[in-house]
Design a protein with these regions (language model features):
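Sec-dependent N-terminal signal peptides
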Residues: 4-13
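C-terminal segment of classical bacterial N-terminal signal peptides
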Residues: 13-19
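N-terminal module-boundary/linker segments of secreted carbohydrate-active enzymes
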Residues: 21-59, 281
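Acidic/histidine-rich, surface-exposed loop or edge segments in extracytoplasmic proteins
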Residues: 30-40, 120-129, 175, 265-266
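Soluble non-cytosolic domains of exported or imported proteins
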Residues: 32, 36, 44-48, 135-139, ...
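Conserved SGNH/GDSL esterase-like catalytic core that processes O-acyl groups on lipids
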Residues: 47-138
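Alpha-helical cap/lid subdomain in secreted, periplasmic
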Residues: 107-235, 248
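Conserved catalytic region of serine esterases and O-acyltransferases that act on ester linkages
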Residues: 226, 230-297
Length: 297
């Protein structure tokens, strides 16, 4: 019994030491709140991930989620920190209330969006071109976490991470040579960085969009690997899969539901999905949330 007690004490001390090394703690996702508020702070990949979330929420009968997007195209973690420190009105701030996006400001500061609501979840990410290069993450990620934690009106907010996805095989993105112009090399490097940041920061909630897109590419063929330009997701199955992943990783966990069976097909738009296409996206997202850093085969 004494040995067991000693082991428990040592484990508790180890956990405390790890948390101390991370600085400010993270907090778990809320459970069944009256209103859930999610803010994405990032770039155009944040847009790709969040754009179709209102459709999925509406189809699920969930009307008590407020969404916000603060983005600058191509914005790195380093630039996020510097834009905050200089209080630059460089962000586009859009918001969804009652499951409909509206543009709040095209000249917002980070604080304009951050202070607008008592956000429950704050989602960050690295710019795609350097998302597989961990030397680009620090010290900027630690500083950004401090900024968000210090300024958020909800002291118990969860800070989460969105994985970026690898480029299409034929992408002409100027930073693709950093990954040998190879999609699988880029995906592997991104996943290694994601696992490293879990060790180095208090973040433990990951939206595995990169793995979901890679799952979809493994299951189905597409001329540009579900991108519209070699790196941004296409407006049909690409963005839909990303939104499904956000839903499964965040919404489903908070409200104890699932993306499986969601009836949204983007009907009435040029991006309407067939049942088979939607189910493939659901499956790619669900598999990614079950296995975040490895393609499901």
């Amino acid at each position: 019994m004494k040995k067991i007690l000693i082991a428990i004490v040592l484990m508790a001390m180890a956990v405390t030491t790890v948390r101390a090394a991370h600085g400010a703690p993270n907090y778990p996702l809320p459970q069944n709140p009256d209103t859930l508020r999610i803010l994405g702070v990032g770039n155009s990949f944040t847009d790709d991930g969040m754009m179709y979330l209102p459709y999925l929420l509406q189809a699920a009968g969930i009307k008590n989620v407020v969404l916000g997007r603060l983005y600058i195209g191509g914005c790195t973690l380093e630039r996020q920190v510097k834009e905050y420190e200089n209080n630059n009105p460089a962000y586009v701030y859009t918001k969804s209330v009652n499951n409909k996006w509206t543009t709040v400001s095209k000249n917002a500061t980070m604080l304009d969006g951050l202070l607008d609501e008592k956000w429950d979840i704050l989602v960050v990410q690295q710019a795609s071109g350097v998302s597989g290069k961990y030397e680009s993450y620090q010290p900027w990620l630690d500083r950004l976490i401090e900024i968000l934690r210090f300024n958020c009106r909800n002291a118990g907010a969860t800070i989460a991470w969105q994985q970026t996805w690898a480029y299409s095989t034929d992408s002409n993105h100027p930073e693709y040579p950093n990954y040998e112009q190879n999609q699988l090399v880029m995906y592997k490097d991104i996943m290694e960085c994601n696992e490293q940041l879990l060790d180095d920061t208090p973040i433990d909630v990951v939206i595995p969009t990169g793995t979901a897109i890679q799952n979809l590419r493994t299951a189905m063929q597409d001329a540009r690997d579900f991108t519209r330009d070699g790196y941004h997701l296409n407006y049909k199955m690409g963005r839909y899969t990303a939104a499904c992943t956000w839903f499964q990783a965040l919404i489903a966990s908070v409200f104890r539901t699932t993306i499986e069976g969601n009836a949204s097909r983007l009907k009435g738009s040029s991006q309407a999905l067939t049942d088979a296409e939607a189910l493939a996206c659901h499956l790619a997202a669900r598999r990614a949330c079950a296995r975040r850093f490895k393609v499901w085969k």
